[in-house]
Amino acid sequence: LFEDEEVAKEINDKFIAIKVDREERPDVDAVYMKVCQRMNGHGGWPLSVFMTPDQIPFYAGTYFPKESKHGLPGIKQVIGYLAETYHNDPKQIEDVTESVKKSLNQVIFKKGEERVTKEAVDQAFHELGKTFDTLHGGFEGAPKFPAPHNLMFLLRYYQQTGKLMARQMVEKTLNSMAKGGLYDHIGFGFTRYSTDEEWLVPHFEKMLYDQALLLIAYTEAYQLTGNEFYKTISEQVIEFVNREMRSPEGAFYSAIDADSEGKEGAYYVWGKGEVERILGDELAELYTTTYNITTEGNFEGKNIPNLINTHFDTVA
């Protein structure tokens, strides 16, 4: 439905849409899944939750067809009804939100008075250590997400405790992501996640929130380490976002689709012959050697430029 222009227009005309990746933010997913279960008696995905500006849910549901059918309300009808009710019958919305708050107060909305303990922070560090990929960086196996919030936590943990392992996990991950195919070495910017453990083959979609959070992670790492590589990546991400994701009105697009020319990633992959025709023999030799571009390719007969097997001291 996100790709349906008619539905997208309905949503954008009547609501502010926020898309959350439940694989990257299972904590957010868990909260609103409880909302859906409490309101409907069941949950599932895809999950849609409609909220007031102060973030109190007043409607939740899972799958909606485009038009109403087989007893299921269509997403267009749901959007229209909720928008009309919100504007014309605010008392009904208020009654629902009050009921939701009372029902969920104990499990979601109640603010805890206890501070996060040192033991809890240490435990979080140890849990990340258990899942850390010492060979390629990152956490757990494929598909592998950047999870910049983990890296920012580890940077702060290192600053407070001096535990070198925390810093090493961050640096290994940042280096591997920026050298791999997860990063666009031509147009810059990070793709959404890697389909393999070594960050080579990405899902080619580029998300605005990934650029923002990874920019924070790389700039904070630069501040801590003084590593110019992190500064370069940060500057390139800013350049990419301003060039490709800023709208003419001055706002930002939320994502760039993975598909082009009828298939995923076609825009981002290269044949060795293409590189040679564009750059000429001398420059092409340097580029293909540096970015591991071969005749056989590393992705469906084409190449995802990467620096995985390249040592920086040989590039300059």
What is the role of each PLM region?
Residues 1-316:
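Replace the tail clause
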